[in-house]
Amino acid sequence: MEGALRRTLNLAKPDDVYNALVDAHKGLSDAECRAFDARLILLLVNHIGDETVIHEALKGAAP
């Protein structure tokens, strides 16, 4: 599915993933949360590896 951002649910256990994200932030300061989020985003961007999809996601996440 290169070049197209998936906008439908693509997780078997989305609640588990959400809870893991929340748990990963527990006990972190605001600055540590931002640093963690930045590292996670960079890891996921590298894993995706498709610049078109990444740019679509950036546009979709913009306020």
Predicted segment positions?
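Active-site flanking loop/helix segments enriched in acidic
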Residues: A24-S29, F36
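N-terminal intrinsically disordered, cationic/polar leader segments
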Residues: E2-R6, A12-D16, D23, A31, ...
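Residue-level signal for alpha-helical context at structural boundaries
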Residues: R39, A62-P63
